[in-house]
């Protein structure tokens, strides 16, 4: 029997072990999509206890605690941090096969030097050990980032954000990890939302451009893109329930905008036309600026209305949308490509059943402007586990060039989650090592080194064009 999560965790063959320990493990981390707060980096926050780090905003964990019958008081409520940690430790015992089990223990091993097992019985021991360790200067946010060998972080930022904390970090020569904004304009696109008109007013004030038409909306966003670019931004991100494409005319879009601007509701057809026009318009701007466009789709959000009204969004009540919008996705990419204005694009679906569909769509729009110009993103959210990652990479290998894959991102709100890159790299090396051991790929050291180091880090550096 193998030891629990030892140095060869998830690595079952000599080749997999060699590829991980000699190549993948040594590579830095480029975290090109996450949800961490730049203010906490700028202020070099130190956490008082492990609950603040682990349970402060992690809806992955909250979801499983609810599944274990834990009262909301101990999840997002007013229970003490020690009580919340106890409930999480008791929940973790039941999480056999869940990536949270592995992530939690990787974090305990790497950051706290704890190689034991966290459960209800050991919770007090782990609580005391972690909290004592968190008081050390080495466990401040900046030092956690540095010891994780992170070279660059892209946060997630709304067009109206001031980016003041990015500026603080930009001016601080004592911290050499780049922390760059990433453009997330969902609120400017979501015309159906009740708060949309209030958002337009904020955008008008921040941009200095009165937004009272679709054309002026795009002008205001271009103004903010210029500001974001001045702060080092070269990455956008869009969260879509599905990728839509509905043919439209400029006159139709202006009429739809005017209808909504007057306070009237719009139809689903009108919403999809508007969002199509929005995505095409900003996509062209990304291409002009050589920005990368990320599209995350396949989510049905905030399904539990009772809890949403209590807790708000991003609290653990989202699910997979199984609608296959591959045809619309191809039409959308084609609309940009037809005028030679398709930017580098990364496509992530929360629905794992469309891995092959994405793999074939991206093959339709590659060109010589960039290696792997259109990428399938790493297994995301409900799929970033061993099976999900293995299936995504296997599908990508079957249909595209896995060697050009840009690899992993944390998509996290936690400063301990960089171990997810290690987790991914172990799974990737196990997959590739298995192919080599089975005679499906040669034991070509030079080629394997290039592929493993590329997927781990180098491909992303080249793809995004960051100065590293």
UniProtKB/Swiss-Prot annotation:
GO biological process: D-galacturonate catabolic process; D-glucuronate catabolic process
GO molecular function, one term: glucuronate isomerase activity
Stored Gene3D superfamilies: Metal-dependent hydrolases, uronate isomerase, domain 2, chain A
Annotated SUPFAM superfamilies: Metallo-dependent hydrolases
Database matches in InterPro entries: Metal_Hydrolase (IPR032466), Uronate_isomerase (IPR003766)
Family, similarity comment: Belongs to the metallo-dependent hydrolases superfamily. Uronate isomerase family.
PANTHER family to which the protein is assigned, alphabetical: URONATE ISOMERASE (PTHR30068:SF4)
Naturally occurring in which organism (per UniProt): Lachnospira eligens (strain ATCC 27750 / DSM 3376 / VPI C15-48 / C15-B4)
Entry superkingdom: Bacteria
Name the UniProt record assigns to this protein: Uronate isomerase
């Amino acid at each position: 029997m193998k030891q629990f999560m030892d140095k060869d965790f998830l690595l079952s063959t000599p080749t997999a072990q060699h590829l991980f320990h000699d190549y993948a493990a040594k590579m830095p981390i480029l975290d090109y999509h996450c949800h961490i707060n730049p203010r906490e980096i700028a202020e070099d926050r130190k956490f008082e206890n492990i609950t603040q780090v682990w349970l402060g905003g992690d809806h992955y964990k909250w979801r499983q605690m609810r599944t274990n019958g834990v009262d909301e008081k101990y999840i997002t409520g007013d229970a003490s941090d020690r009580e919340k940690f106890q409930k999480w430790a008791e929940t973790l015992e039941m999480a056999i096969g869940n990536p949270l089990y592995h992530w939690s223990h990787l974090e305990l091993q790497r950051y706290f030097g704890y190689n034991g097992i966290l459960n209800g019985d050991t919770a007090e021991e782990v609580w005391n050990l972690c909290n004592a360790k968190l008081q050390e200067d080495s466990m401040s946010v900046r030092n956690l980032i540095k010891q994780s060998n992170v070279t660059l972080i892209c946060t997630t930022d709304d067009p109206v954000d001031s980016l003041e904390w990015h500026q603080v970090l930009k001016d601080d020569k004592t911290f050499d990890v780049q922390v760059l904004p990433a453009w997330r304009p969902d609120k400017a696109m979501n015309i159906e939302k009740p708060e949309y008109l209030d958002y337009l007013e904020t955008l008008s004030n921040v941009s200095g451009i009165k937004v009272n038409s679709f054309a002026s909306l795009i002008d205001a966003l271009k103004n903010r893109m210029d500001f974001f670019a001045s702060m080092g931004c070269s990455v956008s991100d869009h969260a879509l329930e599905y990728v839509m494409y509905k043919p439209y005319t400029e006159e139709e879009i202006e009429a739809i905008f005017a209808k909504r601007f007057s306070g009237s509701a719009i139809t689903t057809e009108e919403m999809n036309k508007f969002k199509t026009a929005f995505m095409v318009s900003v996509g062209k701007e990304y291409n002009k600026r050589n920005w990368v466009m990320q599209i995350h789709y396949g989510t049905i959000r905030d399904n539990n209305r009772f809890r949403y009204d209590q807790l708000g969004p991003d609290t653990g009540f989202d699910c997979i949308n199984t609608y296959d919008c591959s045809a619309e996705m191809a039409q959308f990419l084609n609309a940009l490509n037809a005028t030679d204005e398709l930017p580098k694009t990364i496509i992530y679906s929360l629905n794992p059943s469309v891995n092959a569909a994405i793999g074939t769509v991206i093959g339709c729009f590659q060109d010589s402007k960039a290696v792997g110009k259109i990428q399938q993103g790493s297994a995301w959210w409900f799929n970033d586990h061993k099976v999900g990652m293995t299936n995504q990479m296997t599908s990508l290998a079957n249909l595209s060039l896995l060697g050009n894959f840009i690899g992993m991102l944390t998509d996290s709100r936690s400063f301990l989650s960089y171990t997810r890159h290690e987790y991914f790299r172990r799974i990737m090396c196990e997959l590739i090592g298995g192919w080599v051991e089975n005679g499906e790929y040669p034991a070509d050291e030079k080629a394997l080194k290039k592929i493993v180091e590329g997927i781990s880090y180098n491909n992303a550096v080249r793809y995004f064009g960051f100065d590293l």
